[in-house]
Amino acid sequence: MEVEDSLFMTIFVLVFMSFLALFAVLGNGLVLGIIARFKELRTFPNILIANLALADFFNAFINTPVYLLYAVLKVKWFTGKTLAIISLSLLSLFTFVNVVSMLALLVNMFLAIKFDLKYFTWKTNKKAFKIVLVEWLVGFICAVLLCLNCDVDLQKEASVSTYRREVSDKGKPIAPVIISAFVVIAVVLSAMIFRSIQKKKRQVSFFLL
């Protein structure tokens, strides 16, 4: 009975996560395809959104199948330190790029509300691509910092799950610092956006009186 329950859960998780991954790949791929196809849609904010979609696309296309291989299906050949470090690095990279991209969109929203036409005349597609480059650079640095302590001494044929757990444990002192920094920045930006919106509302109300 326990074996049947375990098999059922494995199949359920496999099908469910595969469906989510397929949905994410198709959805984000559609966003990227539309922005790439129509030149008039290649605007400053849309380029930032496209980069967010790209990070999500890679996360679903690469990291989800990898997770299914080592954690759900538990294939015997997916073992060793090298595969563990590569999979953890890719997961960290795409996750951090995703978070940084969302922060960049918050910054874009704040500047658009705060500076109006001055900001609209300043931002260009060329600057958007530079910001995208910075986002990937920041994501890469954060991923490297998280995976710095990869010097784990385990058996050669240890599973990827075991290696990743050991590497993650060694990176725990760094992870909370990085995550806390992102959370603080997001909260501050959200507060600044809210304050700017309230200020604009007061200005509009003043002119209408």
Regions found by a protein language model. Name each.
Residues M1-E2, K74-S92, F120-W122, F140-I185:
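Loop architecture of class A 7-transmembrane GPCRs
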Residues S6-L14, S18, P45-L105, A112, ...:
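Extracellular TM2-ECL1-early TM3 structural module of rhodopsin-like
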Residues F8-F38:
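First transmembrane helix
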Residues M9-V13, I47, K127-V134, I174, ...:
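Alpha-helical transmembrane segments of integral membrane proteins
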Residues L20-A21, N51-T64, S92, F96, ...:
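Alpha-helical transmembrane segments of multi-pass membrane proteins
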Residues L32-I35, T64-K74, F110, A143-L154, ...:
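Transmembrane helix-loop junctions and nearby membrane-interface residues
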Residues R37-I47, M109-I131, A191-L209:
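Intracellular signaling interfaces of 7-transmembrane GPCRs
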Residues S101-I113, L146-L154, A175-L209:
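Class A (rhodopsin-like) GPCR signature focused on the TM5-ICL3 interface and adjacent 7TM helical core
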